[in-house]
């Protein structure tokens, strides 16, 4: 459909033929990634600072256009102005691999008679088309991967199944932020292994680095339309672990000067849009703390930063605008099995922003969030991550729990607004 919208009258016949071909060969994560060129461009300005398959949603984050801000009109002096480019970016919360998450995936694999140890596809079946629907999808890989023969470990020092990296690629994620308080749970070698496994799966990693040279190269992904999107990130802590002085560059931290310098480097290297991620906040708090608020003010005041998103609190935090730019203070988890005394940790959001090109650069013209929820694992009751709205619509899952998740997520997303008003321009899907 996007192709048809951009082709003139002269190309109608060719367009119709292409449309038939597209219908005959539906897009997949692999196809999309083949069209998404990943560019890593050196820039001298970068600095190094001291849960049975579930329902498939029928409405994958399609946001109505009638209430979005109209773009400026084309210059009337141009008879045939070039088509405006757009890019949709999807971000999701923590992939936090507690041992019961693996146990659920192992149960699915055994039940289906599979040879592999784990089957995460069943757990995320309802989320896959949503991830694939975006031009650029970004996950947060919270913890490092183990080696093939290493003993897996869960909280508090994680070593997750290495098979997850390949699965992340198959889901349709194009990049993962990897900076977190667990980044070096398995030391520098675990950090390197995690980045390398993601790279082999066709997924870029952001926020951790295998060498000083890698840190100096902004991560920029180029879409099929040629839109260059830079991603930078940083974490608040390493959980008391320390890197040796000669490896201090291996993890990006969340101080504003560092993140702004990386954003400027990405813009200098050609990025049209720069997304800044941070990992921080108070765990299980639905509101941002003073550090988050101060950091966001600094980041959004920089012309190099176009949008800020975050995770770590393990519960959903507000979405708002600061200095005229969208900020997602916390997306909650994408999957986890936290202590059940924290029921909101079994909920999260995926957020989707559409950037449209104007004569003054790219700006957000559509913004939406999609509430998600999943169950506590027990043998015979495997985890299923469900988009809340479509699950309610289709009558799948625990209705009472879904209704509560829906209400609590809406309250959290709009938590900074007076009287719980909905954030202007933000849609729920």
Where are these regions (language model features)?
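Acidic, metal/ion-coordinating pockets
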Residues: 3-11, 18-30, 35-38, 43, ...
């Amino acid at each position: 459909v996007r192709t048809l919208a951009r082709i003139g009258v002269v190309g109608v016949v060719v367009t119709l033929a292409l449309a038939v071909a597209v219908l005959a060969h539906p897009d997949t994560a692999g196809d999309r990634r083949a069209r998404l060129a990943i560019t890593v461009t050196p820039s001298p300005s970068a600095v190094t600072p001291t849960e049975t398959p579930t329902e498939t949603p029928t409405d994958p984050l399609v946001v109505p256009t009638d209430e979005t801000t109209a773009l400026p009109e084309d210059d009337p002096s141009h008879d045939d102005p070039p088509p405006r480019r757009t890019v949709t970016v999807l971000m999701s919360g923590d992939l936090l691999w507690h041992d019961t998450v693996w146990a659920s995936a192992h149960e699915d694999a055994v039940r289906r008679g599979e040879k592999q140890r784990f089957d995460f596809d069943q757990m995320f079946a309802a989320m896959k088309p949503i991830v694939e629907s975006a031009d650029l999808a970004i996950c947060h890989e919270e913890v490092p991967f183990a080696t093939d023969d290493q003993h897996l470990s869960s909280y508090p020092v994680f070593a997750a199944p290495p098979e997850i990296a390949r699965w992340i690629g198959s889901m349709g994620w194009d990049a993962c932020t990897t900076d977190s308080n667990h980044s070096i749970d398995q030391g520098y070698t675990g950090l390197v292994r995690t980045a390398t496994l993601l790279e082999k799966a066709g997924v870029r990693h952001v926020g951790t680095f295998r060498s000083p040279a890698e840190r100096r190269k902004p991560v920029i992904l180029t879409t099929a339309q040629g839109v260059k999107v830079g991603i930078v990130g940083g974490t608040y802590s390493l959980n008391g672990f320390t890197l040796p002085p000669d490896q201090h560059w291996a993890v990006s931290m969340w101080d504003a000067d560092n993140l702004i310098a990386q954003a400027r480097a990405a813009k200098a290297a050609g990025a049209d849009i720069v997304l800044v991620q941070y990992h921080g906040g108070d765990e299980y708090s639905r509101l941002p703390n003073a550090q988050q608020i101060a950091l966001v003010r600094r980041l959004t005041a920089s012309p190099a930063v176009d949008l800020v998103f975050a995770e770590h609190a393990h519960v959903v935090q507000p979405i708002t605008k600061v200095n005229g730019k969208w900020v997602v203070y916390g997306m909650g988890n994408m999957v986890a099995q936290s202590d059940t005394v924290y029921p909101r940790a079994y909920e999260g959001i995926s957020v989707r922003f559409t950037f449209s090109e104007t004569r003054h650069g790219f700006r957000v013209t559509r913004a939406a969030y999609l509430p998600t929820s999943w169950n506590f694992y027990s043998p015979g009751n495997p985890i299923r991550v469900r988009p809340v709205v479509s699950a309610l619509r289709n009558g799948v899952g625990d209705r009472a729990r879904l209704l509560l998740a829906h209400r609590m997520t809406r309250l959290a997303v709009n938590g900074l607004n007076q009287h719980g008003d909905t954030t202007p321009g933000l849609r729920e899907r």
